[in-house]
Each structure stands twice: as structure tokens, then as C-alpha cells.
Amino acid sequence: MDGRFFYSPQFDGFNFGVAEAPFAQLMAVLANESDGRFVYMGSTHTSEILPGFEQENPLDLVRSKPTGPRIWIGNSSRIGTHFDESDNIACVVSGTRRFTLFPPDQVGNLYPGPVDTTVAGQPTSLVDLADPDLERFPRFAEALKHAQSAELQPGDAIYIPALWWHGVQSTGQFNVLVNYWWQDTPADAGSPMNALGAALLSIGLLPEAKRLAWRAIFDHYVFAGREAAVEHIPERARGILGKSTPELRSTMREFLIRELKGR
């Protein structure tokens, strides 16, 4: 394993196990340097194991955002290059962490793995950042031209924009990171990953000419901005193209559920 949390060689599972254990047991394993195991507790709300932490360690930059700090604890490990849907500020508390970031447009050069079976929730690059196999993944050489890396010590923090790919290497017997995720969309907004899944089920099965036609339609209704798509439609007649409100989002969600069930 060499500290790399990843898929099994046959991609029929993972090269690590998942278990629930008391926090004290995790600390005991990390305190025993002769244990030899790679141990990792990821993305745990501080309120679950460190009550009062959030109140004593507020992050003013995101104080107004609907977020709560999460804590990551382990020893030396490598987390594959992936992206998160939320903006992120990550703060190193103990140990050293090296972050390598790639802009979203490098997705094709990063060779992402499965969408529905993932190491930690989001698609992960199949390239080993510490030892890239450029014969198997030749386009990764282009991705490296766009990479940005930073090595963080205790007290350092890094801002990772939403959808930026990032790989993380942790070193040290006791490594701790606290991060703050947030989004600038309403809490009841849908996840773009769900939209991706629906698109794979529908648009992804169409011939190329129809896929390109749908690209133009999505550009008009989604990517060009809502106002450009509706400025010629009377406001009272805009329907789901109208101004986004909690009521409208609820209606849209119910509509989508009915449509998916009907198919």
C-alpha cells in the first residue's frame, strides 16, 4: 500500500479497510510508532469528537458561510488527486502536507477513475502523483505543466477553489488537518454530480450530432447564465426558468423525481 489509499489492483474494491473505532484507539495506534499500519480518519465533524472546537477556533473568512470545521487525523499517507464541489480552506495543525493542484480544465489529462465507485466520494485520478507512469498515462505530462504545489507546515493554510483537482501527501507519525468547506449556493440547490449522472444516462447515449446539439442547448440555458435565456420571455411565463426561490427549487425537484421514476 505504501500509504496510498486507492483501488485494489483488480479494481474490485479498495486497498484499505474501513472500520469504526473509539477516538482513543486511533490515538493509541498513532502513538505506537512500531505499529506499522497506515491509519487515517477523514472528514469528521469536530463537533463529534472535539466539542467546543468550532467556538474556540473560528475562521473569520468563512464565519458567515454555512459550514462547520472537519478534522483529518492520520500518519503518513497519500490521497489521490480528486476534486470537491465546495470551496475549501485547509489548515495544517500537525505534521507536513504537500498539496498539488490542477485546474478543472485538466480533467482529461488526469485520467479520472469511476464516477460511482470512488475512494472518498468524488472521482479520483488513476495516476500515482508520487510515481506517475507516463507510458500508461501520457497526457499526464501536460497536466503537470499546469500543476501548482505547496508544502504546508503547522500553522499554514491553503485555499482550494471548488472543482480544482488536488492530491495530498501527508508525512509524519501524527498528522492533523482542519478544513472548512462552504458553497455559495442555497442549501437546497441540487448537486451538479447528480446532473452529471442524469446526463450520462441520457445525453451520453446519443450519437455525436445529437450530443453536440444538446451542448448548444445547455450552453444557452445553463452556462450562458439564466438572464440571457429568459430576457425575451414575460416574467409571468418563465416557469422553471424564472427567478430561483425555495418554492421553485422544490417544484423543480419534484418534477425531476417524477420524471426519473417514470423512466
Stretches with model-predicted labels:
Residues 1-157, 167-263:
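N-terminal accessory scaffold of Fe(II)-dependent oxygenases
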